[in-house]
């Protein structure tokens, strides 16, 4: 049963990718690749200059001096990564996230947001399972305050498959509460 649900899910994703128009929108005329942006370079130079000015307050080879030198290198590396990526910068010299459906920019917004939803769902699914387990005990409130770590870890490790488990529970009707279990306030 799980394999059929998974096959249908993969089929839906594949079909939507095949029929998706990848040239949905053009980028705003004010955005330029960060490597070509003069404001981006000015922002890099200003950041480096501020850090180098801080160096004058400390003795060479002191802990603070070394820390600021490392921060300068990290800043250069960060700006270099931005310049080499497909990020586009605005008139302010800052990289902008493109969320228009263009797959060239999927790493900027789409992939991180899907990962966020997956991780949030994983945590929620594990918490739901643990709370349902707690309700079966004689002192459920105590088990919510003093967490049974081995049991909680069991739910946490099994939660990675939460999308498939949620579909399974939805199909058999145990995911949603029935209407008679939902209370309504008098009006």
From Swiss-Prot:
**In the UniProt record, does the keyword Cell cycle occur?**
no
Keywords in alphabetical order, please.
Chloroplast, Membrane, Photosynthesis, Photosystem I, Plastid, Signal, Thylakoid, Transmembrane, Transmembrane helix
Spans through the membrane: 107-127
Give the matching InterPro entries: PSI_PsaF (IPR003666), PSI_PsaF_sf (IPR036577)
Q: Report the principal subcellular site.
A: plastid
Gene3D superfamilies (UniProt xref): Photosystem I PsaF, reaction centre subunit III
- Tell me the superkingdom of the source: Eukaryota
The way it spans or sits in the membrane comes to: Single-pass membrane protein
Q: Give the SUPFAM superfamilies listed for this entry.
A: Subunit III of photosystem I reaction centre, PsaF (SSF81536)
An example Pfam family from this entry, by short name, is: PSI_PsaF
Q: Which GO terms describe its cellular component?
A: chloroplast thylakoid membrane; photosystem I reaction center
UniProt-listed GO biological process terms: photosynthesis
Signal peptide positions on this chain: 1-28
Question: Where found?
Answer: Plastid, Chloroplast thylakoid membrane
The text of the family note is: Belongs to the PsaF family.
User: What job does the chain carry out?
Assistant: Probably participates in efficiency of electron transfer from plastocyanin to P700 (or cytochrome c553 in algae and cyanobacteria). This plastocyanin-docking protein contributes to the specific association of plastocyanin to PSI.
Its recorded name reads Photosystem I reaction center subunit III
The gene coding this protein: psaF
